[in-house]
Each structure stands twice: as C-alpha cells, then as structure tokens.
C-alpha cells in the first residue's frame, strides 16, 4: 500500500469514519480495475479460525465481515466496466463448511472452469496445512526471540495489532523505529501461545485479534524487559 494508492480510491469512500485500512481497500480495488482485471473475488469472512478455545467467540470485526458489500455498492467502475465481483459470505473456522461453501461458489460462478469438488476440497486441506505450518514458524521465531532477549539482557516490544499492520503504509514505520532504539520487535501472534488469560475477563472476548492481544498482555506481565505497544488505525 501507499499514500498514492489510497488516493486512487478516495472518491468511492462512503464514510470518513471508517478505519484507514478500510479506506485503503478502495485504492486496491481501483488498482485492480485499472489493470484490467475482470474478476475480483472478495469474500465476506464472518469468523476466523478459533485459536483460543476458551474465548467467547471468534468473529472478524464488522468492517472485515461486511466491507466487500460496501465496495460492491460504492465503486462505480465495477458496474461501468462489467467486472465480475464475487463476495460470498463464509467462515474460516469450520474446514468442512468452508469446503462446502467454496464448492457452491465455484459451481455457480466458475462452472466453465470445470473444477471438481474433490479438487476444491484437496485445495482447502492443503491451504489449511500450510496456514498451520506458517503459524508454527511464527511461534517458533517468537520463542527464539524471547530466548535471545533474556539470554543477552535486551529490551523487547510486543507490537500488537492486526494482520494489516504488517503493511508499511499502515504501520507508519513503527517496527523500524523501535528497532532503531535497540529494542527487539515481536508480533503478538509470535508469543501469545506462551500465556493464558485469567478468565472471566471484564470484556466480551469475541474478536480473534483481541483474544491474541489479551494473551500477549498476559505474557508481557511476566517480564521486566518486555513491554507491549498496541497499534490502532481508527
């Protein structure tokens, strides 16, 4: 992302109060249209994978859940240029449900591609396997970083946020700034598995990324040389 990309989609932003990452979506969609893309698949994902089985729920935030509807109804070039815009509602938590939903979507929108249901189901299995392997790599890197911090008596910052905070345009260079102060940077998903929150909480723990945040805060409590900074884009 970039400021220039953001500006490309400014005219279709429906509300000034939506978060900056939400506004950035307009620029990305306009960029795809300008490149001549004729089909855009932008599902509305209601639930994430439930990483913490003790949480109250595992919703995505309302913007993530419904923003494809905003795009569909507020980006005029989608209709002007006859773009096939596909935004089915689905959940990522139930693998079998996801397989069934994708089979429905592909049979309806992509019948001409002749993709079999078995191919779709195998693809979901492979994707989930890779997702879990990726998350395991992140956790392993977090454990190694914590070990190094403790062994060498360094200072560290858990930079907690949402996945879009990996985007330099969204995080505004905060990871690099913290590194320049001779402090290690860890993401909340690299260490949150090392702690458990004490329940009940005084809040409804229903958002997946907040669930990580609470566990990350619990983790930081145990260390004098590790602090937590929360990134927020609202």
Describe the function of each predicted region.
Residues 1-234:
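An N-terminal assembly and electron-transfer interface module characteristic of large anaerobic redox
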């Amino acid at each position: 992302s970039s400021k220039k990309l953001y500006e490309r989609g400014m005219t279709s932003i429906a509300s000034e109060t939506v978060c900056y990452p939400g506004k950035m979506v307009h620029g990305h969609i306009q960029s795809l249209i300008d490149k001549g893309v004729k089909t855009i698949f932008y599902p509305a994902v209601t639930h994430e994978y439930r990483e913490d089985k003790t949480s109250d729920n595992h919703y995505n935030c309302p913007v993530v859940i419904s923003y494809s509807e905003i795009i569909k109804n507020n980006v005029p070039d989608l209709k002007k240029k006859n773009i096939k815009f596909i935004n089915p509602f689905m959940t990522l938590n139930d693998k079998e449900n996801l397989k069934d939903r994708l089979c429905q979507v592909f049979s309806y929108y992509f019948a001409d591609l002749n993709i079999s249901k078995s191919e779709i189901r195998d693809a979901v299995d492979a994707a989930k396997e890779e997702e879990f392997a990726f998350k395991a790599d992140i956790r392993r890197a977090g454990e190694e970083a914590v070990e190094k911090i403790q062994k060498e008596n360094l200072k560290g910052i858990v930079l907690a946020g949402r996945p879009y905070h990996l985007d330099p345009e969204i995080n505004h260079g905060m990871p690099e700034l913290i590194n320049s102060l001779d402090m290690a940077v860890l993401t909340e998903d690299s260490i949150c598995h090392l702690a458990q929150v004490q329940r009940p909480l005084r809040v409804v723990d229903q958002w997946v990324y907040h669930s990580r945040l609470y566990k990350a805060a619990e983790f930081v409590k145990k260390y004098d040389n590790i602090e937590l900074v929360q990134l927020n884009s609202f």
